[in-house]
């Protein structure tokens, strides 16, 4: 916003675009978290006698240390979950600001 207290349509549109981009990020990160959860569950339920493979680029490598892989997956899932929480907080903040700006715009 400029010197005026009344928000411009450009200000409101910029916030709407930012909000839309954040929602896209939240959806993407949420899907990734879900995939990690499924992978962790599958790995935990896997018969220890059966080999487990990990994708590295275009090749599959057999995993020697399942516990290490499981901890790595859990750590990545936790990091994504924390990032998701921060994005949700940011979304809420921007949504409130958007609503306030839209209300100010309509009043004047």
Where in the sequence are the language-model features?
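Short, charge-rich amphipathic alpha-helices with coiled-coil/heptad character
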Residues: 1-20
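A structural signal for alpha-helical segments
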Residues: 7-10, 24, 31, 68
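Short amphipathic alpha-helical/adjacent loop interface patches that line ligand
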Residues: 19, 33, 77, 84, ...
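Short, basic/low-complexity N-terminal boundary segments at the transition from targeting/disordered tails
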Residues: 20-41
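Amphipathic alpha-helical coiled-coil segments
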Residues: 26, 70-90
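Charged, heptad-repeat coiled-coil alpha-helices that serve as long linker/dimerization "arms"
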Residues: 29-30, 46-49, 84-85
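Short coil/loop "hinge" linkers that interrupt or connect long alpha-helical coiled-coils or helical hairpins
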Residues: 42-68
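Non-transmembrane, heptad-repeat alpha-helical coiled-coil rod segments
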Residues: 45, 89-108
């Amino acid at each position: 916003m400029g010197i005026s207290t009344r928000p411009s349509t450009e200000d409101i549109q910029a916030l709407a675009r930012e909000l839309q981009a954040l929602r896209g990020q939240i959806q993407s990160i949420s899907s990734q978290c879900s995939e990690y959860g499924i992978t962790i569950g599958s790995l935990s339920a896997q018969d220890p006698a059966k080999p487990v493979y990990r994708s590295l680029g275009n090749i599959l490598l057999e995993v020697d240390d399942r516990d290490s892989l499981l901890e790595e997956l859990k750590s990545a899932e936790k990091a994504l979950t924390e990032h998701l929480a921060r994005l949700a907080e940011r979304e809420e903040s921007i949504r409130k600001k958007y609503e306030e700006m839209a209300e100010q715009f309509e009043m004047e």
